């Protein structure tokens, strides 16, 4: 069959053929090969790596499915892996659920699944259990994916936004808004093809460079809502305020151009391969050096600080501070 049919989700022969010829082959690993209703994971590896489990789930509905730098499949691995990794854990296992629209081209599904398998394998992640549903035309837009992931948090790592205090500083691991601007360019046909590429990446290797540095306090990956959403979460968790410097924000010229053209702010744009990191001030130089030593952190910068006065503010290019509010809604729906 060249297209997904309702029969592919019925539990019958068509579904078994899809599972065996596509998912089992692409995601092949010992846990999946058991074909039980659940993945049976040996605790020994997890216990050896930490004393707590980090467990996260996310759903992916991005439109379009394919974009410069990635696709919904790569995103479904990177996004959930990063949500686990910012705890200090190394993501090891993922589940995967597909909701497919009747009529979806089989080649589209194969391309997405192949990308998922390649991304997971490169990151040392096993997709150990999954599910597939097919719904009638129009009940879903082409293809939605849910993934859940887990890893073990080392006993000596206790990162968390509630530990922030006045005097701490904030770093970002690279340029802001690459993913959001890339998707916006595609949707609005702004003609910047070639200049904009999503930053979609698994950040575990970058985060590992920070695990042994004293003074690292909290990490978040700045996805929906961008850096602005993360700093508001940090401020709410610690009960302090946060002040950012506009002049310090690393933004690529093409992304800045999109923002100026449409009256948007890169601080609110989604990223899929960037960290916001809170550290003690005296650790900032060492953390920046570690980030700069890795390709995923080469554009890292110190962008702000935690202050006693509550609220989130942005110091403009001429030093004037203004309150930085969260938008009422995501400026770019279905961004991930």
Curated annotation (Swiss-Prot):
CDD domains: HypE. Pfam families: AIRS, AIRS_C. Its EC number is 4.2.1.-. GO terms for cellular component: ATPase complex. Keywords: Lyase. The modification S-carbamoylcysteine is found at residue 336. One of its GO terms (molecular function) is lyase activity. Modified by HypF, which adds a carboxamido group to the thiolate of the C-terminal cysteine, yielding a protein-S-carboxamide. The carboxamido group is then dehydrated by HypE itself to yield a protein-thiocyanate. The modification S-cyanocysteine is found at residue 336. One of its GO terms (biological process) is protein-containing complex assembly. The keyword Aminoacyl-tRNA synthetase does not apply. Homodimer. Forms a complex with HypF. Also forms a complex with HypC, or HybG, and HypD. Belongs to the HypE family. Involved in the maturation of [NiFe] hydrogenases. Along with HypF, it catalyzes the synthesis of the CN ligands of the active site iron of [NiFe]-hydrogenases. HypE catalyzes the ATP-dependent dehydration of the carboxamido group attached to its C-terminal cysteine to a cyano group. The cyano group is then transferred from HypE to the HypC-HypD complex or the HybG-HypD complex. This is Carbamoyl dehydratase HypE. It comes from Escherichia coli (strain K12).
